[in-house]
């Protein structure tokens, strides 16, 4: 029994700071591109100014850090899966947030994020039952549609950013293509940590090249202060609207189903299999992290699978590496100058990089759909209907123009339409199975199941 014990202690073993810090920093760098992409894209889509976007990025990094501490360090027996995981903005939430923001503004996004977080935290103990309604056929359809529908956002950035004077200028497209190329080259010729930060390298190299083309302005950095405490409700008192809350709650539940897969995978990697109890604490922490996100002007958080890849690479299994990463994120979030640096990334560079990122989201969804038994009653039809309905609303939103606005919001928001279609059709075709006592299927990210 001794060996089992040392394996278990690996997760909780404390390393000296000089070892923890570089590893923690690696985790921060691996999730950094994804973490700043969400506020940059949301800010761009909602036409916020550089100062507001700087604030969003700072709030995001700060809250990422707190959310990571809640999961990796945990709070007693209440919160946290206590595994080496890093929390960052969920990409699944990006397109619903843009829709809510365009229709109602930022404060309604935060209202919806807060309520959805509370709902998730409250539902944590019965999450095992809820998961039956979200099998791979549902989550895979939603995540595929999310990735596909976000490509239009990435394309707009690649062309110069919505509303930009030079929109569609060939040099914008060339810069986006160059950034994409850098990411592909790094992925082909490097291994390990360098490969894990390929997108970040693409963003940095792309921005350097753009600065020689006179496309980068550092005024936001010089104007930003060195220290600023993140202010709760900076953009105003949150507004609560039912349609926005329903949208956000569906997104949060599906992000939590994803997170469960990550927890189980990480548990397997660090040889500390997850108990039901630790999973409940993990889901509860996801909800509380999201509630904090809404209060601190940030976003819904979820455990990032990119970082799990690093765990496998670095062979260091202790959760204190992620605790260290969380502390680094909190410190970065208090330094607006650092957040302002990210706002200097020109739209085409961001577009080239997010094109790959969102493409990967779609592929993740497809990977989940690979697990679905296509010969079984209705599964093919469920996916076909969900993806078609989800993409249809995105491509031809005018179709819903005459509907009441709450219905319009949900149908126009592709991923939500896809998820609801898949949930309803799955209940229709497979209800016997869903309500039987069989084990629910939880998707475990591919690169992690080895």
Locate the predicted segments by residue.
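Intrinsically disordered, low-complexity non-transmembrane regions of multi-pass membrane transporters
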Residues: 1-23, 218-233, 268-272, 282, ...
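Membrane-embedded alpha-helical modules
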Residues: 100-219, 324-326, 330-439
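Hydrophobic, membrane-embedded alpha-helices of multi-pass small-molecule transporters
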Residues: 18-31, 35, 168-180, 197-198, ...
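Membrane-embedded helical hairpins/re-entrant loop segments and their flanking transmembrane helices
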Residues: 17-19, 43-82, 247-319, 444
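Hydrophobic, small-residue-rich membrane helices and short re-entrant helix-turn-helix hairpins
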Residues: 12, 189-201, 226-230, 235, ...
């Amino acid at each position: 029994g001794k060996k089992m014990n040392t394996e278990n202690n690996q997760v909780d073993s404390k390393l000296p700071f000089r070892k923890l810090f570089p590893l923690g920093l690696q985790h921060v760098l691996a999730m950094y591109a994804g973490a700043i992409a969400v506020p940059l894209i949301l800010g761009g889509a909602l036409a916020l100014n550089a100062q507001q976007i700087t604030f969003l990025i700072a709030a995001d990094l700060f809250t990422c850090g707190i959310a990571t501490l809640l999961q990796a360090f945990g709070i007693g027996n209440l919160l946290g899966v206590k595994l080496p995981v890093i929390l960052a903005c969920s990409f699944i939430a990006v397109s619903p947030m843009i829709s809510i923001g365009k229709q109602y503004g930022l404060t309604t996004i935060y209202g919806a994020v807060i309520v959805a977080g509370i709902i998730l935290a409250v539902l944590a103990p019965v999450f095992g039952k809820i998961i039956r309604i979200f099998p791979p056929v549902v989550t895979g359809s939603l995540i595929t549609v999310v990735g596909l529908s976000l490509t239009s956002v990435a394309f707009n950035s690649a062309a110069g950013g919505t509303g930009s004077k030079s929109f569609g200028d060939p040099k914008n497209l060339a810069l986006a293509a160059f950034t994409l190329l850098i990411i592909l080259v790094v992925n082909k010729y490097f291994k390990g940590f360098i490969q894990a930060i390929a997108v970040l390298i693409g963003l940095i190299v792309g921005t350097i090249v753009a600065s020689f083309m006179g496309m980068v302005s550092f005024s936001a950095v010089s104007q930003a202060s060195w220290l600023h405490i993140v202010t709760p409700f900076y953009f105003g008192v949150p507004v609560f609207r039912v349609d926005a809350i329903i949208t956000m709650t569906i997104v949060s539940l599906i992000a939590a189903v994803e997170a469960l897969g990550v927890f189980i995978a990480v548990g397997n990697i660090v040889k500390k299999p997850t108990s039901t109890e630790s999973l409940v604490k993990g889901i509860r922490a996801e909800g509380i992290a999201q509630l904090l996100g809404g209060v601190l002007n940030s976003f819904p958080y979820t455990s990032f699978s990119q970082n799990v890849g690093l765990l496998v690479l670095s062979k260091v299994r202790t959760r204190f590496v992620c605790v260290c990463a969380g502390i680094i994120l909190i410190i970065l979030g208090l330094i607006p100058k650092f957040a302002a640096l990210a706002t200097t990334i020109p739209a085409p560079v961001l577009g080239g990089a997010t094109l790959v990122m969102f493409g990967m989201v779609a592929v993740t969804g497809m990977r989940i759909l690979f697990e679905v038994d296509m010969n079984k009653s209705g599964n093919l039809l469920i996916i076909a209907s969900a993806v078609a309905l989800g993409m249809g609303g995105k491509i031809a939103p005018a179709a819903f123009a005459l509907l009441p606005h709450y219905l319009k919001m949900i149908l126009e928001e592709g991923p939500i339409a896809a998820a609801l279609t898949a949930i309803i059709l799955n209940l229709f075709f497979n209800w016997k199975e869903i309500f039987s006592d069989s084990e629910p299927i939880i998707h475990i990210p591919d690169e992690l199941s080895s």
